[in-house]
């Protein structure tokens, strides 16, 4: 479903769902370039979407982040990056043990 590893939470499931079992490292990659976002997991691209499009807004409206259900989240996500299309990188978990290693950021021209 759309709440598993590498998915776009509550919007797009990662296909294939190729996460490794507990105790093994997963390799993740998120590429954002001119509004196109690609999620990769364990050396396979698992989903793609496009920010700042009607499709993006429609996906938000069909999710838990809709304007009716969560107005602040909708506003932030629908306008992510602001006028300059810049933002932040965040690492998140929901109370379970989690480890990160070898984090790299590359600016695409």
Each language-model region and where it sits:
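Carbohydrate-interacting regions of secretory-pathway proteins
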Residues: 1-109
């Amino acid at each position: 479903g759309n709440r598993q590893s590498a998915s776009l939470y509550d919007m797009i499931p990662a296909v294939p769902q190729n996460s490794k079992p507990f105790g093994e490292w997963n390799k993740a990659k998120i590429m954002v370039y001119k509004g196109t976002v690609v999620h990769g997991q364990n050396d396979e691209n698992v989903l793609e979407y496009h920010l700042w499009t009607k499709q993006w807004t429609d996906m938000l409206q069909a999710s838990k982040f809709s304007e009716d259900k969560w107005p602040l989240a909708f506003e932030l996500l629908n306008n992510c990056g602001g006028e300059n299309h810049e933002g932040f990188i965040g690492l998140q978990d929901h109370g379970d043990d989690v480890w990160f290693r070898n984090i790299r950021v590359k600016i695409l021209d």
